[in-house]
Curated annotation (Swiss-Prot):
N-terminal signal peptide: 1-19
Name of the top EC class for this enzyme: oxidoreductase
Recorded catalytic activity of this chain's protein: [(1->4)-beta-D-glucosyl]n+m + reduced acceptor + O2 = 4-dehydro-beta-D-glucosyl-[(1->4)-beta-D-glucosyl]n-1 + [(1->4)-beta-D-glucosyl]m + acceptor + H2O
Cofactor note (record): Binds 1 copper ion per subunit.
Encoding gene per record: LPMO9B
Name the record gives this protein: AA9 family lytic polysaccharide monooxygenase B
Provenance organism: Podospora anserina (strain S / ATCC MYA-4624 / DSM 980 / FGSC 10383)
Length: 327
């Protein structure tokens, strides 16, 4: 019995670890920008302290030196996968029955390269929950994360047409609720993208602070999805009037359905020139434009398109074929 229990526990832990994920790539009106403007997290683990400033943009491993150009009224497509640099559809974007809502926020900043996310945030997108008439419990119902899995990790998000032009952080968040029956059990996964919006208006959406956009005791955060459900309240504020929502369980559309790696030429962005020391052994011969990766950030790997030069005092180490890290 002890042997069985230990084996089952080990299998469960392995499944949970494999199910961890990160938002990694960004498409803009169908153009693939890869991870160039994504503040890639150090790991694919969730943030468990809801009061931490890490709730804003995660524990950042790679801070890019570029911003993705986005037009007001356009559509961006965030992309999530389990392993860094792995954009295949052979495994779920967020597996292990990690069901829950997906939300996207914006915050207006003076410079997306240096902003810390302490400015006010407003929600521009939700994909939450819908009852499955054929299901018995919440696990069987339709969820935002299931839509991510159905669309190879992609989720279309409309940029409001009336927000002011300028720099923003765009924050994608998925909340896994498989262990949310007790306080603190919900698992938020988030990534921030650095963008510059053009052609905007003069709207001033109401904002909330992050951390603080939800509490551990909120009904959409502490919830048992393993029993029958009759309703669900998505955590955080309401979606701004100029934003959009997706009905959970609806079909993939637009870029969700048609955008695949190689279907659109990846647009390369030019970062500001900086002085850096090339990192040996990364196979890239240095980074384009002179950008640098801070210690413990990603510097290479299959499918990776960001900076490959480590900051002085660290070198690019090959962890596996998908992930090289400055150490």
């Amino acid at each position: 019995m002890k042997s069985f229990t230990a084996t089952a526990l080990a299998a469960l832990l392995a499944q949970q670890a494999a199910a961890h994920s990160t938002f990694q790539q960004l498409w803009v009106d169908g153009t693939d920008f890869g991870s160039q403007c994504a503040r890639l997290p150090q790991s694919n683990s969730p943030i468990t302290n809801y009061n931490s400033n890490d709730m804003r943009c995660n524990i950042i491993g790679t801070r890019p030196q570029v911003k993705c150009p986005v037009r007001a009224g356009g559509t961006v497509t965030v992309e999530m996968h389990a392993q860094n640099g792995d954009r295949s559809c052979s495994q779920e974007a967020i597996g292990g029955a990690h069901h829950g809502p997906v939300s996207v926020y914006l915050t207006k900043v003076s410079d997306a390269l240096t902003a810390d996310g302490s400015t006010g945030w407003f929600k521009i997108f939700d994909d939450g929950w819908r009852k499955n008439p054929s299901g018995r419990v919440g696990d069987d119902d339709f969820w935002g994360t299931k839509d991510l899995n159905a669309c190879c990790g992609k989720m279309n998000v409309k940029i409001p047409s009336d927000i002011p032009s300028g720099d923003y952080l765009l924050r994608a968040e998925a909340i896994a609720l498989h262990a949310a029956g007790g306080a603190g059990g919900a698992q938020p996964y988030m990534t921030c993208y650095q963008i510059t919006v053009s052609g905007g208006g003069s709207a001033s959406p109401p904002t909330v602070s992050i951390p603080g956009h939800f509490k551990a005791s909120d009904p959409g955060v502490q919830v048992n999805i393993h029993g029958a459900m009759t309703n669900y309240v998505i955590p955080g504020p309401a979606v701004y009037a100029g934003g959009s929502t997706k009905v959970a369980g609806s079909a993939c559309s637009g870029c969700e359905a048609t955008c695949a790696v190689g279907s659109s030429p990846t647009t390369s962005l030019t970062p500001p020139v900086s002085t850096s020391t090339p990192a040996p052994g990364n196979g890239g011969g240095g980074s384009p434009g002179g950008c640098t990766v801070q210690k413990y950030g990603q510097c290479g790997g299959q499918g990776y398109t960001g900076c490959t030069t480590c900051a002085a005092g660290s070198t690019c180490n090959t962890t596996n074929q998908w992930y090289h890290q400055c150490v």
